[in-house]
Amino acid sequence: MLVIPPGLSEEEEALQKKFNKLKKKKKALLALKKQSSSSTASQGGVKRSLSEQPVVDTATATEQAKQLVKSGAISAIKAETKNSGFKRSRTLEGKLKDPEKGPVPTFQPFQRSVSADDDLQESSRRPQRKSLYESFVSSSDRLRELGPDGEEAEGPGAGDGPPRSFDWGYEERGGARSSASPPRSRSRDRSRERNRDRDRDRDRERDRERDRDRDRDRERDRDRDRDRDRDRERDREGPFRRSDSFPERRAPRKGNTLYVYGEDMTPTLLRGAFSPFGNIIDLSMDPPRNCAFVTYEKMESADQAVAELNGTQVESVQLKVSIARKQPMLDAATGKSVWGSLAVQNSPKGCHRDKRTQIVYSDDVYKENLVDGF
C-alpha cells in the first residue's frame, strides 16, 4: 500500500508557485492584445473617414478659400515684410535687439541643460591640462627666468612686449604668418637622448666584448680538455705508444738498448728470444712495470730485433719492442771506453747477478754426522 502524505512537498510547492506566475503573465498578455486591437481599430476608422472624403483639386480649393475670405468666415494670412539679404539666425537677431541681455535660452535637442553651478563643479573635477609653456619648460628653467622676488628677471627683451607664449601653429600678424621658434628645452632633451643612446651603444659594445672573451675562454678550455684526453689515451696504450708517438715529425731513434713490454716475462724467455740477433751485453728487468731493457753490442742487431720481434708472441707472451728513449752508455756498450763498460756492469740498471758461487751441501754429510753421534 502506498502512503501519500497529506501536505505538499517542497518541489510540488515550487511548481505550484511557478504555475500561478504563468497564469498571471498569460492574463496580462491577453489584456495587452485587447488594447492593441482596439487602438488599431480606432486608427482604421479615422483612416476610413479620411479616405471617404472626396478628393478636391487645388483650383477648386483656392476658389472655396477666396469665397470664405470674402464672407468673413476666414481671415486672410498677412505676408511678412522681409528685408532682402542673407538669412540670420534667430539667436543672432535677439543679440542684436538686446545686446545687454545674454543669449536667449533656446531648446537644443542634442545638448542637456546644465546650470552654472554644475559647470563649476565639472571644471573642478576635470584634470586641468598644462599649458604649452608648462609642458615644454621645466620648473628649473622657470625659476631661472624668475627673479629673486618671484618676478620675471629683467633681461634683453623683458617688458618690451607681451609675455612669451609658446603658441604652436601659425599666427596672423599684419597678414604674414610666423611660426613660434621651439624652446630651449627641446635642444636639451635632444642632447640628453643622444647621450643616452651613446651610453647604450657603449654598454652593448662592452657586453659583446665580454661574450667574445667568454667564447675564447671556452675554446681554450676545450683545447686543454682535448690535449688531456689525448695524453690519457697515450698513457693507457702504454709506454710503447708514448715512445713512438709522432713518428713523422721525429727522426727514427738510434741505439743499442731496447725497451721490451710484456706481462709475465722472465730472463730466460728474453735471452732465448733476443740472443739470435746479436751479443747481449746487459739485460735488466722491472717486474712491477712489466718491462725490461736489453742492450746489444751493435746497433744493427737492435734494429733487427725491433723489426722481427715487435708485436709478436713468444711463449704466450705478447711483446712490444722499441728503441729505448734513453741510451745511457752508448760508448760503453760499443766498447770504446774501459770505464764505461765497468760502469755499465755495476750500474743499478745493469747486471744484478751475484758472481759468488753457490755452495751446495749433500744430505749424506748430515746422515753421517747423525749416525756417528748416536
UniProtKB/Swiss-Prot annotation:
Post-translational modification Phosphothreonine, affected residues: 266, 268
UniProt entry keywords in alphabetical sequence: ADP-ribosylation, Chromosome, Coiled coil, Isopeptide bond, Nucleus, Phosphoprotein, Repeat, Repressor, RNA-binding, Transcription, Transcription regulation, Ubl conjugation
Residue span of region 27 X 2 AA approximate tandem repeats of R-[DSNE]: 184-237
Annotated spans, Disordered: 30-58, 79-252
Positions with biased composition (Low complexity): 30-43
Record Gene3D superfamilies: 3.30.70.330
Purpose of the protein: Essential component of the NELF complex, a complex that negatively regulates the elongation of transcription by RNA polymerase II. The NELF complex, which acts via an association with the DSIF complex and causes transcriptional pausing, is counteracted by the P-TEFb kinase complex. Provides the strongest RNA binding activity of the NELF complex and may initially recruit the NELF complex to RNA.
The protein's name: Negative elongation factor E
Gene (UniProt): NELFE
